[in-house]
């Protein structure tokens, strides 16, 4: 179940043991904090949500935006660069690392999935791989991004795409499974 990282490929999937009791307790505590303090916070209180996420181990740069309806499974596996965004309704299943570079955007109701099951294993072992969105990458509305995917600098996944392979810089992909459908001009900061 391993593939090489790079354009059109996924990172190697890592077999994981069952979550420990401490992991389950931490996720339970985070779930309570999300429900009571994160989710009901006013839309413009991005700073408050950054504080809550950092308290649970997330590495979040100033200016990163996380909307109140975004769900983060394990904040300690989340890294967000300056100006990056997790939009409304995003589901960040961060069993492994989810890394958003500067100005990377994940739009409404997208699903970032870092884990799956090994269908070749009779016990269906949990396997994970990180998801990386490099600088200015954009996951648009309702896109599914699978384990081990990297969207290189400026790459775009068009609405409702299913992205299971990494995407080259400044390339636009769409469909199920996602395939290149265009390019966008490079942008300098």
State the predicted function of each range:
Residues 40-50, 70-80, 85-150, 176-177, ...:
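Flexible, glycine/small-residue-enriched loop-and-beta-strand segment within the central core
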Residues 1-58, 62, 136, 154, ...:
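Terminal amphipathic alpha-helical/low-complexity segments used for targeting or macromolecular assembly
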Residues 61, 150, 168:
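Short conserved AdoMet
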């Amino acid at each position: 179940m391993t593939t090489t990282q790079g354009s059109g490929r996924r990172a190697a999937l890592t077999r994981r043991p069952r979550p420990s009791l401490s992991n389950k307790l931490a996720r339970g505590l985070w779930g309570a904090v999300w429900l009571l303090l994160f989710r009901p916070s006013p839309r413009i209180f991005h700073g408050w949500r950054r504080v809550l996420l950092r308290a649970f181990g997330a590495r979040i740069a100033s200016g990163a935006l996380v909307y109140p309806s975004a769900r983060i499974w394990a904040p300690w596996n989340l890294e967000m660069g300056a100006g990056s965004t997790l939009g409304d309704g995003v589901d960040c299943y961060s069993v492994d690392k989810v890394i958003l570079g500067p100005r990377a955007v994940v739009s409404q109701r997208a699903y970032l999935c870092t884990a799956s099951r090994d269908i070749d294993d009779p016990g269906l072992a949990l396997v994970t791989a990180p998801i990386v969105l490099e600088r200015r990458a954009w996951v648009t509305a309702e896109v599914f991004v699978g384990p081990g995917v990297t969207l290189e600098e400026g790459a775009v996944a068009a609405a409702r795409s299913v992205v299971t392979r990494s995407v080259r810089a400044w390339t636009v992909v769409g469909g199920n499974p996602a395939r290149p459908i265009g390019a966008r001009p490079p942008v300098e900061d």
